[in-house]
């Protein structure tokens, strides 16, 4: 949990930071103590417009995000890892996702849009020690403007090489600002046993979508220019690349591959999935279900096989189960899981001695009437599935999409996780580490510059409420499960 040491002046705290304020600006002193910063006014003035957030955490790393360009000369210290200064809004260079240097011009953005950021390693330095082979910093700093309609400056930083189950102070300093305690984060404890497999789940791709919003429409002018890809395509390519860098051995796309399931959109989605750097499993969502279009044949021509009947894939440490909940009619947002399909999912989960991860598009509905829009599976079908799974294999995690948000809840021994879309705020993908004794989920934002600029803009949807509702809490996004302890 991040515990900020300062309040953005004149800003509401609701939905921005977790509880746990630490009072006025403080600076680390002797071991086990803190002392007030002498230049508290200057620190507040320089950093009030730069809210830092811990978006993701796992057992060995943390992802930090920010909405505005960092102040000049900003350094972050986490444990004994010290970053190079993060680029300010006036920097003449754009640092790509993994530290390569790009000039901020249209040619660069075109290359990033078509091929994605190149990989490399940005060194971490510091007075106490330099980062070793297993401790490195990867960071991203945006240019002043990506899309002229939106203020630029959002960024992400991933700090690796941390110790599991350890609380770290996040210490910041900048030009003219002394070192002070900016926050605190605790890494997760991994499940017992060895790490066996890593996979990534992505949801609600919506290939073919050109605008976002319900109460008002947000348009992506960058994606409409020559040589640029639309934001759903950029977002999925960026997520694929970053998940592969993270170590994912398999991608699972949890439905809504397209916007309207036209033949052209299905072909574009199939080609996009076929170009992924790792194998792909996919299920269909309500946006993929259109009468008169043979979606399965179209996707199969690109090597993407989806079936109406549930199927399984065994990986080290777990059985992965996939089922389509798109239903057999054209009612928008409606999910269906007939009893026969629910029983088949439970049979697949109970056939093996390993735990199971079930991937659906629509989440189970735990109440008789939907309390959240869009609705998930019908309540009766949800209860039948959950009861059957609880009896067949209590060590089961159900991962869903559809609602474009991050939430975690349970039913008996089962854990249910909803994860957000790749293409709207927060613009993220979910990583799953499968251990001998459990599974660890972490949801990270995609940091590719032309993706981050768009997803930051979409947080303004629904009169600004989307940015508060969609990301969920840190505990909804990142958690560790030990089988038999839930």
Go through each PLM region and give its residues:
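His/acidic metal-ligating clusters that form di-metal
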Residues: 63-65, 72, 84, 239-250, ...
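N-terminal active-site segment of His-dependent metallophosphoesterases
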Residues: 49-50, 56, 63, 70, ...
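Active-site environment of divalent metal-dependent phosphoester hydrolases
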Residues: 208-211, 259-264, 286-293, 328-332, ...
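Acidic/histidine-rich helix-loop elements
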Residues: 90-102, 203-234, 290-305, 328-337, ...
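Beta-strand-turn-beta hairpins that frame and shape the catalytic cleft
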Residues: 189-200, 208-214, 312-322, 351-356, ...
């Amino acid at each position: 949990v991040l515990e900020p040491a300062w309040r953005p002046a004149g800003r509401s705290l609701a939905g921005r930071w977790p509880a746990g304020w630490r009072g006025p600006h403080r600076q680390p002193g002797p071991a086990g103590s803190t002392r007030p910063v002498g230049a508290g006014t200057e620190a507040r003035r320089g950093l009030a417009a730069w809210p830092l957030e811990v978006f993701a955490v796992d057992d060995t790393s943390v992802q930090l995000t920010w909405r505005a360009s960092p102040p000049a000369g900003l350094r972050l210290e986490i444990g004994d890892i010290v970053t190079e200064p993060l680029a300010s809004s006036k920097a003449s260079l754009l640092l790509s996702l993994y530290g390569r240097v790009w000039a901020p011009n249209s040619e660069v953005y075109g290359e990033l849009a078509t091929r994605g950021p190149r990989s490399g390693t940005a060194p971490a330095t510091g007075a106490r020690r330099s980062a070793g082979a297993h401790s490195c910093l990867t960071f991203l700093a945006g240019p002043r403007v990506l899309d002229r309609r939106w203020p630029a400056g959002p960024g992400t930083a991933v700090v690796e090489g941390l110790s599991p189950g350890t609380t770290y102070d996040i210490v910041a300093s900048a030009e003219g600002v002394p070192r002070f305690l900016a926050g605190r984060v605790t890494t997760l404890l991994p499940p017992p046993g060895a790490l066996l497999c890593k996979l990534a789940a992505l949801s609600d791709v919506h290939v073919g979508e050109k605008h976002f919003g319900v109460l008002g429409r947000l348009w992506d002018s960058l994606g409409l220019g020559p040589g640029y890809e639309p934001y759903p395509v950029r977002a999925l390519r960026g997520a694929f690349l970053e998940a592969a860098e993270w170590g994912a051995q398999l991608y699972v796309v949890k439905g809504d591959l397209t916007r309207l399931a036209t033949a052209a959109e299905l072909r574009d989605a199939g080609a996009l999935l076929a170009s992924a750097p790792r194998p792909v499993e996919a299920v269909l969502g309500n946006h993929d279900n259109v009468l008169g279009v043979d979606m399965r044949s179209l996707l199969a021509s690109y090597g993407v096989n989806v079936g109406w009947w549930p199927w399984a894939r065994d990986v080290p440490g777990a059985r992965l189960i996939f089922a389509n909940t798109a239903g057999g009619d054209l009612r928008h947002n409606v999910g269906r899981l007939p009893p026969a399909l629910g029983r088949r999912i439970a049979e697949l989960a109970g056939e093996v001695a390993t735990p199971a991860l079930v991937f659906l598009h629509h989440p189970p509905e735990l109440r008789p009437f939907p309390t959240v829009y869009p609705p998930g599976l019908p309540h009766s079908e949800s209860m039948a599935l959950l009861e059957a799974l609880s009896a067949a294999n209590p060590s089961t995690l159900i991962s869903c999409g559809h609602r474009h948000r991050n939430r975690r809840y349970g039913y008996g021994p089962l854990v249910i996780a909803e994860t957000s879309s790749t293409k709207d705020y927060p613009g993220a993908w979910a990583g799953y580490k499968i251990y001998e004794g459990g599974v660890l989920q972490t949801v990270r934002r995609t940091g590719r510059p032309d993706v981050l600029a768009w997803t930051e803009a979409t947080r303004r949807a629904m009169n600004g409420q989307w940015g508060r509702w969609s990301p969920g809490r840190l505990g909804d996004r990142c958690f560790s499960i030990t089988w038999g302890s839930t």
